[in-house]
Every structure is written in C-alpha cells, then in structure tokens.
Swiss-Prot record:
Keywords: Ribonucleoprotein, Ribosomal protein
Source organism of the structure: Anaeromyxobacter dehalogenans (strain 2CP-C)
A GO BP entry: translation
Disulfide bonds listed in the record: none
Domain of life assignment: Bacteria
One of the record's GO cellular component terms: small ribosomal subunit
NCBIfam families tied to this protein: S16
Family: Belongs to the bacterial ribosomal protein bS16 family.
Pfam families the record matches: Ribosomal_S16
Single GO term (MF): structural constituent of ribosome
Keyword presence, Repeat: no
The protein's name: Small ribosomal subunit protein bS16
Amino acid sequence: MAVVLRLSRAGTHKAPFYHVVATDSRNARDGKYLEDVGIYDPTKRPERIELKVERIEHWLKAGAKPSQTVAMILKRAAKAAAPAAPKA
C-alpha cells in the first residue's frame, strides 16, 4: 500500500477548504483515508494552516510521500513556525 499525504476537498461551492490526509494512493481524492492530519483554508487571509506535526512526521518516517501542494504547505508552515533570526 503506497501511502500519500494529500488534500481532500471539503466546504461548499466556491468556498472550499481542504483536509490534509494520509491515504492510499489508489483511493479517490475525497474517498476513504487513514488519518486526518491537518486543515488548509486558502480562502482566509492570512491562510489558515493547522497541522498535526507529530503525526505528519510519523507518516513521513513510515514512507508516505507528500503531494506537491502538501509539500509546499509544509514548507510554508515550517517557515511561519520558525523563530526569526536575531539581527546582529
């Protein structure tokens, strides 16, 4: 079973938000998933990104591959969570 981290669409017509899920790569986009590991809402300003970092790390260590979009979201969330470097 090839596990991937990808987005599953939720919300209403013209007002989507997405769940970040761990799922088998053969399942449909909005089909069954193994675990819900976060939320991404691009319609809010600033964008709403809530991730269960420990669970995402678990799935990545177990061999899950993130989709391109999820990889971008993870980088953006890591950058936002990192403390700003002090200016010398």
